[in-house]
Amino acid sequence: MVQVVCGLIEDGGRLLACRRPPGKHLGGLWEFPGGKVEPGESPEAALIRELQEELGIETEITGALSPVEWDYGRGPIRLIPFFCRIVTGTPHPHEHDELEWVDAATCARLTWAAADGPILAEWKAGDVATSRTPTP
């Protein structure tokens, strides 16, 4: 099973949503930024690397949510979501065609990649408080 990470980048009660470009697998759907874990890499290190590559930002992980197993027809994935915050930089889409900061109400109008659905539901339900790690 392919290990994939994603980051719920928080800013004032909003999360950063990224739209996959047309012509790419799942093109036009919204997702949380991230990518595949490389061999020998921890999920946390993979997320920090992917967010720097995809958005040009340095981040810090502040918590975790429940992993999601999904199959888009190309083999199963295990999507490992983390909460994080921006340490330096401003997000710019290097691999997506649009970025949008969304709150719980506005994220409902976006069409999300299916594996992100359970993550969104957990975030909206507020069931993540016990999963958060304290920030210094």
Predicted segments with their positions:
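Conserved N-terminal beta-strand and adjoining loop/helix that marks the start
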Residues: M1-L15, K36
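Conserved hydrophobic "DFG−1" position in protein kinase catalytic cores
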Residues: I9-E10, A17, C84-I86, W101
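A conserved beta-turn-beta hairpin within the catalytic core of GNAT-like acetyltransferases
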Residues: K24-L29, W101
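The catalytic Nudix box helix
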Residues: F32-A64, D103
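Active-site-adjacent beta-strand/loop module that shapes the phosphate/pyrophosphate-binding cleft
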Residues: E58, P67-T90, E100
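NUDIX/MutT-family hydrolases
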Residues: F83, H92-K124
